[in-house]
């Protein structure tokens, strides 16, 4: 199934395999999510499934969203995501999507917003080297030259300089699920994922495994 699931990053820990090796893992509280809309090719032009996740207060949901969510029997859902599918067989409006749709050993792609670090210098933001620290140098952490002189007489767009660092949507691909805990809605994923603890994550079956497209992935 190409439908993913929404979850919340709980933090990192370590997982011991059968050989006693410590493996860094991320704990994700995934779902349960509700199917809030089913889109069909006849009506919408393509087939897709929309799911909702996360509790919120009623006053934070506007009337159009409240009317949309009422159709599936759910009103207080904070986050909505859509997944394109080839067919809608076996899917029902209001049905729950849980971690049971994943299994240990499966490859997944995890998307989220990276940690925001505010306005940062070019060294922290881009990993540039610093200037000399002695021999009278005053250029310790300054950016240095940013372009030519009279021609072109400007700084080209995209020049790597100081600015806001982090807070970007990123995807970590090909992570392995080491354990699925259906009782606590937990996914134990090998490695790290974007975001800080509490961040919203989108977990989808991997589109590629190695150099080949994953079976059922698009």
UniProtKB/Swiss-Prot annotation:
Swiss-Prot/TrEMBL GO biological process terms: translation
Single annotated GO MF: rRNA binding
Highest taxon of the lineage: Bacteria
One GO location term (cellular component): cytosolic large ribosomal subunit
Region (Disordered) residue spans: 127-167
Keywords: Ribonucleoprotein, Ribosomal protein, RNA-binding, rRNA-binding
Gene3D superfamilies reported for this sequence: 3.30.160.810, Translation factors
HAMAP family: Ribosomal_uL3_B
Role, per record: One of the primary rRNA binding proteins, it binds directly near the 3'-end of the 23S rRNA, where it nucleates assembly of the 50S subunit.
Family per similarity comment: Belongs to the universal ribosomal protein uL3 family.
Protein name: Large ribosomal subunit protein uL3
Gene that this sequence comes from: rplC
């Amino acid at each position: 199934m190409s439908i993913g699931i929404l979850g919340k990053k709980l933090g990192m820990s370590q997982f011991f395999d059968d050989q006693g090796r410590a493996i860094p893992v991320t704990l994700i509280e995934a779902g349960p999510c509700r199917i809030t809309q089913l889109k069909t090719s006849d009506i919408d032009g393509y087939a897709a499934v929309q799911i909702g996740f996360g509790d919120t207060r009623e006053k934070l949901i506007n009337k159009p969203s409240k009317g949309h969510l009422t159709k599936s029997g759910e009103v207080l859902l904070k986050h909505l995501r859509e997944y394109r599918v080839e067919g809608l067989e076996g899917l029902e409006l209001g049905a729950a999507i849980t971690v049971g749709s994943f299994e240990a050993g499966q490859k997944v792609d995890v998307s989220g917003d990276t940690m925001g670090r505010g306005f940062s210098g070019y060294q922290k933001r881009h990993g540039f080297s610093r200037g000399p620290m002695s021999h009278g140098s005053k250029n310790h952490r300054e950016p240095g030259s940013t372009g030519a002189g009279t021609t072109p007489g400007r700084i080209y767009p995209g020049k790597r300089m100081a600015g806001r660092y982090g807070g970007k949507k990123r995807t970590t691909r090909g992570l392995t699920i080491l354990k699925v805990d259906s009782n606590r809605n937990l996914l134990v994923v090998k490695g790290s994922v974007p975001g800080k603890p509490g961040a919203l994550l989108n977990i989808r079956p991997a589109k590629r495994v190695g150099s080949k497209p994953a079976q059922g992935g698009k």
